[in-house]
């Protein structure tokens, strides 16, 4: 999963993102609801603001790779989900790591399917670079 670890690293260190994500821990020992996973952990609540990161495009086998990831920005209201998605895109867009760069686009908000769901504003992160 080229880029997943790097996306996670940036988001866990960005104060703008962390200010909007639920902290289930304490000030001394924070536990922010950010995970590299396709499905949210079962312990996370529908009322929380959360982020999940996963590779959503195929692996590139060439020397130059171009791989898409999805960052799901979920929250109890549409406005909170949009604000979180904007913060994620701002934190990641045009960030460079060794041999890779991120380009972001904020997708349309997906409304809750039912009362057990919340709003999701996905961010597509295009990870480009050389191996």
Please describe what each predicted stretch is.
Residues 1-58, 79:
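Small/polar-rich, solvent-exposed N-terminal microdomains that initiate assembly or binding
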Residues 26, 43-45, 63, 98, ...:
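A generic structural signal for short, solvent-exposed coil/turn residues
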Residues 18-19, 69, 99:
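Residue-level detector of short coil/turn "hinge" positions at structural boundaries
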Residues 70-91:
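Mid-chain, well-packed structural core segment of small domains
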Residues 16, 89-98:
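A common structural junction motif
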Residues 79-84, 98-101, 130:
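Short, surface-exposed, polar/charged, turn-prone segments marking secondary-structure boundaries
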Residues 1-13, 54-66, 100-131:
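Short, charged interaction patches at domain edges and termini
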